[in-house]
Amino acid sequence: MQRVLRAAAAGIGHASGHRAPRWGAAAAAARWLSGGREAMSYDVVVVGAGPAGLAAAIRLKQLCRDADTDLSVCVLEKGSEVGAHVLSGNVFEPRALDELIPKWRQEDTPIRVPVSSDKFWLLTKNKAWTLPSPFDNKGNYVISLSQMVRWMASKAEELGVEVYPGFAASEILYDENQIVTGVATNDVGIAKDGSKRETFQPGVELRGRMTLLAEGCRGSLSEKIIRNHKLRESGQGQHQTYALGIKEVWEIEEGKHKPGSVIHTVGWPLDSKTYGGSFMYHLDDRQLAIGLVVALNYQNPFMSPYDEFQKFKQHPAVRTILDGGTVLQYGARTLNEGGFQSIPNPVFPGGAIIGCSAGFLNVPKIKGTHTAMKSGMLAAEATFKTLVEGSSMELYWENLKKSWIWEELYRARNYRPAFEYGFIPGIALSALERYVFKGKSPFTLKHGIPDHEATDMASLHSPIQYPKPDGQISFDVPTSLYRSSTNHEHDQPPHLRLRDPTVPERVNLPLYAGPESHYCPARVYEYVTDEKGDQKLHINAQNCLHCKACDIKDPKQNIEWTVPEGGGGPGYTVM
């Protein structure tokens, strides 16, 4: 508990105006001295200060205000401040925000660059062919999602929500009937060897009558809940599929900057068997968001999404935009692509899963912020009715299936699995779905095998020789990592855990050429030669961007991503 007070005093989240926790110092000290964990009670505990979690918190407090009642609501965020771990494209569709805060356009918000043009390119190695754009971005905005959630956090606090950045929820709390009763943050001040350092502080229990998990894609607690309660099976039934998005924000030359310009591409540098594409979005202040998204069911274990992104930037049509510019920030994050077929039942005893932890991304739109926010709002409404009016959280699941989220994702359900048949068949099936069936086709395609099973043996492929970075347009990983402001306490237990420590050298390296050393966009995993001349896996956990790619793509599902000490990880400000 003293850690909580000390963190607040040190100004964690101070830039966003977050208040110090209102917990009793005397009682906290007594429990700390006795070795116990401080436990605080709220009506609702929200894990994750992203668009879904904050939309849920805001909606709850709005309902309380309208009903002249009150529910205590807290939001935990593992990043050092709100937005520090949030990364997205982002062309923002304001539909959910219009419902949540109808007069937002009259306020000073970071949502200020409307889409002005929308282009779609097919890239070959040296050419960019303009195709009809399949996107309808009229009325949408080019934004930094990390900036938007900071604004949302301030709106939540105005309504009385307590927002606590720098605290990582690491444990689900249950009662004797196996009903979730909240979460606990991890202990800090534990050394790599498991001993307690002088700075040791026990974690804090945040107990709630209702717990909403809004951890984002592949949330560690959410995945445990989904497995333990078989929520995938009681939902739409199919496994989730994923992609890895790698992004930079540049400051480009004034003459090349076109605020609101949106460009998407498909084709080069990815091969015809790999689903993915790139984006370039012009924000304000001469800023350009540029990124590459690669589906994680790719086959070639030698592929490096990071190096594919560096190669993409060297395309003549792309380089001409970047020349003379400067990189401001770098980051990476996985995203859900399973869509309608992969939606789990989001309700569990004592709470619900919202946002990208459940997986509401609309793949053909390349948008998930509006659906994440709406899911949080629906969960908040069900939570309010459950706690105040005696209803049931099943109302969230019922209303979700009646909402525009469900309609949107149903119409979009066949686009992603269409590309299981290859690039050209995927384009053809997508065109059929869009222009002929208009999302109402009489069939529903299934996803292929899970992403980790899609990785081929290395013997079926040749190593890929990527160009060396030039230091102007393309960069090595250490340079990019520095731009992510990633930082972790070095002397702490590893948060990247191997279920079987022999698998990397026994299976991954000889059979798959050590794919973790290729897919990780932060070079966390490296095979190094020991004094005996043997190759051993070395884990640079301090480099971790919290993207979750390893938790998804490892061929034998041997890597478990868990939360490190709160406040560690990337420090995004404009992503």
UniProtKB/Swiss-Prot annotation:
SUPFAM superfamilies xref list: 4Fe-4S ferredoxins (SSF54862), FAD-linked reductases, C-terminal domain (SSF54373), FAD/NAD(P)-binding domain (SSF51905)
Non-spanning membrane segments, not crossing the bilayer: 82-103, 343-363
InterPro entries in UniProt: ETF-QO (IPR040156), ETF-QO/FixC_UQ-bd (IPR049398), ETF-QO/FixX_C (IPR007859), FAD/NAD-bd_sf (IPR036188)
Binding site for a ubiquinone: 276-277
One GO molecular-function entry: iron-sulfur cluster binding
Transit peptide: 1-33
Keywords from the named record: Electron transport, FAD, Flavoprotein, Iron, Iron-sulfur, Membrane, Metal-binding, Mitochondrion, Mitochondrion inner membrane, Oxidoreductase, Transit peptide, Transport, Ubiquinone
Gene Ontology CC, one term: mitochondrial inner membrane
Domain 4Fe-4S ferredoxin-type: 535-564
Binding residues for [4Fe-4S] cluster: 520, 544, 547, 550
Essential cofactor(s): [4Fe-4S] cluster; FAD
Catalyzed reactions: a ubiquinone + reduced [electron-transfer flavoprotein] = a ubiquinol + oxidized [electron-transfer flavoprotein] + H(+)
Compartment(s): Mitochondrion inner membrane
Pfam families on file: ETFQO_UQ-bd (PF21162), Fer4_ETF_QO (PF05187), NAD_binding_8 (PF13450)
Chain positions recorded as FAD binding sites: 44-58
GO BP terms: electron transport chain
E.C. number: 1.5.5.1
Job of this protein: Accepts electrons from ETF and reduces ubiquinone.
Family, per entry: Belongs to the ETF-QO/FixC family.
Name by which UniProt lists this protein: Electron transfer flavoprotein-ubiquinone oxidoreductase, mitochondrial
